[in-house]
Amino acid sequence: MSTPTAFDIIVIGAGPAGQKAAIQGAKAGKRVALIERERGIGGSCVYRGTIPSKTLRESALQLDRLKAAGAAFDFKLKPDIQIATLLNRLEDVISAHDTFMSRQLRRNGISLLHGRAGFLDERTIDMQTVDGGRQSLTADAIILATGSRPRNPENIPVDHEHILDSDSLLSMIYLPRSLTIIGGGVIGCEYASIFALLGTQVTLIDRAPAPLQFMDHELVTHFVKLFEQQGGRYLGGQQVMEVRWDGAAHVVTTLKDNPPVKSEKLLVALGRQANMEDLNLAAAGLTATEKGTLAVNQFCQTDVPHIYAVGDMVGAPALASKAMEQGRRAARHALNLPVGDAASTIPLGIYTIPEMASIGLDEEAARERYRDPLIGRAKFEEVARAQISGAGQGLLKMVADPSGEQLLGVQIVGESATELVHVGQSALQQGATIEFFIDNIFNFPTYAETYRIAALDILGQ
């Protein structure tokens, strides 16, 4: 084998985490190789996950606004509308992202290589190129950012035509009249609310009594209520016995304690698993955990100190924002540059309809720690902006310590929740008191007024 090409840093995977790691290394003046097995840059986030689903979501919201604005007219989607029509902006969005990122990589002198990469030893990478050739590379530091793929259980025959996963869902040609979704996590709930708003009859099934078990229960109850108002159905506490295509027109889902559910299409949304089967981890002295991830420390170092793992490789929460920060931290630590303290408050945003967001402690967590925290609530119907926008069905919760002095957390369900949460994030990072929200003036009319209303509710003013 020829002499390996030497780099300072090799990054495997060009998703959000890998991009940030590579750029951070290059900005420090180091030789960086970024290896990506797909043709495009951005990973599943750009091509099969975040960007496509949010583009479809925006189309659903725009259509809903058209319906509301033209209430006097009989506005309906054509029964045979194609998914591609609803995603007509997606190609432009992806193209703009790809152009921008390619320019960024070139400007920073990063070597972008396409192929499948695996370890030969703890410092050497063997890459199979797209034309079948092989190339070996070596580096002082290696950052693994290979992302994840849908976790499809063996007892559900995903065929990507009738029974789909989140990677193949948007490859459907036509908007289905009915859709069953198995899994009440983030992906399942986001797609359930989007397709329900588009007029599809959606049945969301989960083992838990309520979806999104990690979220504030009051917010989830609010979401489920609005989902069902859109025509959706939630079946909680269910055990799926069998999923099969009947060979004619329906996917049949057999439940243990309920009648079978029939639908044109079915989405399996039971989480994701890290992509590591091609990496030959054993050659580098690495072993995956029982959950199929890699264990890392606060600097994203694995058990082999010069090998780092970031993003979906290290498990939940599967947030692009978290992954990008991990990529940055890993690269800086590998180069002995100041890393800074890890962010203690990472906002969680869920792009359901309506949106949900959380930062800090929710009510349940605060009760475990403080026993009697104070809770302030602001209903969106109390602010003029929500009424103007026709989005009065929302709620902001503010959690404070028992004295009503210190802010502990903020949870929001409703329009612009994923933007609003950053006010709470900034306040938490600065150690703001509840009085802070009362003493400050917010623009009128805005959704941000809900912070002041919730603070007043805590203090009984």
Language model region names:
Residues D159-P176, P260-H333:
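FAD-site-proximal beta/loop scaffold in flavoenzymes
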Residues I10-E38, I51, T55-Q62, L335, ...:
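Flexible, glycine-rich terminal cap/loop adjacent to redox cofactors
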Residues G13-P16, R39, I182-G185, D312:
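Glycine-rich Rossmann-fold phosphate-binding loop(s) that bind the pyrophosphate
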Residues A17-Q24, I163, G188-Y191, L197, ...:
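Short glycine/serine/threonine-rich phosphate/pyrophosphate-binding segments
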Residues T50, T146-Q201, I205, Y234, ...:
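Glycine-rich dinucleotide-binding loop and its adjacent helix/turn
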